[in-house]
Design a protein with these regions (language model features):
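Extended glycan-interaction surfaces of carbohydrate-active proteins
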Residues: 1-13, 39-72, 107-136, 173-246, ...
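Amphipathic alpha-helical segments of tetratricopeptide repeats
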Residues: 88-89, 153, 272-273
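Alpha-helix C-terminal capping/termination sites
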Residues: 15, 27-31, 90-92, 154-157, ...
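Active-site neighborhood of glycoside hydrolase catalytic domains
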Residues: 138-182
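Non-catalytic C-terminal accessory modules of carbohydrate-active enzymes
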Residues: 257-352
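Long, well-ordered mid-to-C-terminal structural blocks that present hydrophobic/aromatic surfaces
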Residues: 248-254
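Aromatic-rich carbohydrate-recognition surfaces in CAZymes
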Residues: 11-117, 137-145, 251, 261-264, ...
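Acidic/polar, glycine-enriched structural segments that form the non-catalytic walls/loops
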Residues: 1-11, 93-96, 100, 155-157, ...
Length: 352
């Protein structure tokens, strides 16, 4: 079992910490305990995927025997579908029957939450009402967009071509919804509002660029860097001094993916100096000022994924994987050894 940790959260799993953040990283390592932990997390959720159209719980506690869902639907099905699909794509495995049914359940659940404008409805996001999120928020919609992308590739590998094409159509619908509903010009940048009626910049506007939506990527990343970057991390919103490291880690990976490698490298070095080598060594933290900046291991998996998802920009096709490296000027060569991709350990060198 992999649990968030932090001196408090043990024998429990969360849809964001375990399924969305950690499971995709575990797939690359080929560590036996981590593979067990990834599949344990998936398995524990199986009984909660129901025929009553109820959201899955945000967290399963006490070794999966009970649950917590105090914030309602946080977009947890989207988190599960995204992270679990990526796990199987990275491993080069097809899901067994239980996992296959779980992925299909999540896809159906998300589809039923797509509003007429193309956004995906949820009660809140992973911040659980600490900040406003409206009836539909950018995080849930962007993760859903990414989830249908990777799930569609997995379906293609499974020979489910019609269902894969349906995923592509749902992706397009959500992308249109994100543009129409959340697209906005804020602080002089063509970027996104986090939910309808909100005109302040939020850190999670980095998610569409991370998930591959390019239309407002530069504006969103510009706004974040100018207004929210501070001391090696991101403020969650421009009007409050609240920090959640997870968004900073997605942001750095998004900078790499957007081709802004020098900027990404500078941000990564600053984060490493502050978090890994500085006063909060040796891990990134959950939040400030909440809970004394405790360490959570799921966020640390996101730090590792800056390299795989950002600098190397690993992608997936029906046949295998792709690499689209983004090397900053400071690096002339990158060597990767014993990374697990699509059925085996691989080593490769990236030269400019």
């Amino acid at each position: 079992v992999h649990s968030p940790g932090g001196g408090q959260y043990y024998a429990a799993v969360w849809c964001n910490d375990e399924c969305e953040y950690a499971t995709p990283w575990f797939a690359f390592t080929d560590d036996a305990a981590e593979q067990d932990a990834a599949k344990t997390a998936m398995h524990w959720w199986a009984p909660y995927m129901n025929d009553r159209d109820l959201p899955i719980p945000s967290s399963l506690i006490s070794e999966g025997t009970d649950y917590w869902n105090g914030a309602g639907d946080r977009g947890d099905a989207s988190m599960f579908l995204y992270g679990s699909s990526r796990y199987f794509l990275t491993r080069g495995e097809l899901p067994a029957e239980e996992a296959k049914a779980q992925l299909a359940w999540c896809a159906d659940y998300i589809e039923r939450r797509i509003a007429s404008d193309g956004t995906v409805l949820s009660d809140t996001d992973e911040l659980e009402n600490r900040l406003s999120s409206g009836d539909a928020n950018l995080s849930t919609s962007a993760i859903s967009y990414g989830a249908f992308g990777v799930y569609g590739v997995l379906l293609s590998r499974m020979g489910e071509k019609v269902e894969a094409e349906k995923c592509a159509a749902l992706q397009r619908k959500i992308a249109d919804g994100i543009e129409k509903t959340f697209g906005a010009r804020l602080t002089g940048e063509d970027c996104y509002r986090y939910h309808a009626g909100l005109d302040e910049v939020r850190a999670w506007i980095c998610l569409p660029p991370y998930m591959g939506i390019k239309s407002r990527a530069d504006g969103a990343l510009n706004a974040i860097g100018r207004l929210l970057w501070e001391n090696g991390s991101l403020k969650t919103t421009e009007n409050e001094n609240v920090v959640w490291d997870r968004s900073a880690l997605y942001y750095i990976a998004a900078l790499f993916r957007a081709g802004r490698a020098d900027e990404a490298w500078a941000r990564l070095k600053e984060t490493a100096a502050t978090r890994l080598l500085g006063e909060r060594a040796p891990y990134v933290v959950e939040a400030y000022p909440e809970n004394g900046m405790r360490h959570l291991s799921g966020e640390s998996a996101l730090f590792c994924r800056i390299i795989t998802d950002g600098l190397l920009d690993v992608g997936f096709t029906e046949e295998g994987f792709t690499l689209s490296p983004h090397l900053p000027a400071a690096l002339s060569r990158v060597e990767v050894k014993d990374i697990f991709l699509c059925g085996g350990r691989r080593s490769f060198t990236v030269d400019k």
